[in-house]
Amino acid sequence: MFQRLITGIALFSLAAIAQADNHTNAWRGVNLDQQFGIQFEVCQLKPGKTLDDMAKLNDEVRRLFDETGLALSLMRLTPMYSHGMPGEPAASYIDVTMGTIEAFGTGWDNWLASKDAVKLMAASDKIATCTFKFARAINRVAQIEALDSTDDRLISMNWCSKRDNVSWDQLKTKHDAWQAAYENDSSSMAWNVVLPRLGAGNAHGRFMHMVSYANAQQLMANENWVANGGSARALGDYYSAYAACDGESVWSASYLYKNEG
């Protein structure tokens, strides 16, 4: 991630959402200067079911997003480097929905009022068991041109807990310093900090760094920077002094629906 970032630190961002607006820092209907909503639908395929079975519902998903007027964007993430271990499988896939917090309120009301949408959810339930998690996201960096150039990307996620002897203001100051160094000198496309809210469970009080990469070359350029470019010391300082983190997982992501607002 953060190639050449202030002594080289690494780790953050999801693909925000952005179609350039000449007057505000906005992308795909979201003001990136404000916290926005991110919903994670974490899914485990049922025995005998595959991602191909779920993909057969994709056209209906797109139709209903249009029909119900959802001002939201939807990506499907499948594991590339997951935390899953033998006997402890990771999620089969995660559907990530992004938009303004207000759009989630209107969107859920419209979705649940649609008989076809309820029918679609029932069809999905026959293929996978899913749980919904709603979070807020703070965009730190969005390379708009790069984000708009492709519907596919790799996304890293790293869950962290603030160290007890560090205040939230001190942690924010650290992130501010990274952002200042990162914005114009990075091989990744986006960095968001995610704050779990509804359905958070034991993730309450934690935060997640999400970073988006255009391809594996960008991802491995960051890994090379960590290994050979001097970033390891800065990462070690962050982990020991500021936050205890689980380590990064990496997911392959593709848009199912893009809000063009």
Where are these regions (language model features)?
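Bacterial N-terminal signal peptides that target proteins for export
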Residues: 1-9
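N-terminal signal peptide c-region/cleavage motif recognized by signal peptidases
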Residues: 13-18
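Short S/T/G/P-rich N-terminal loop/turn motif that feeds into the first structured element of a domain
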Residues: 19-261
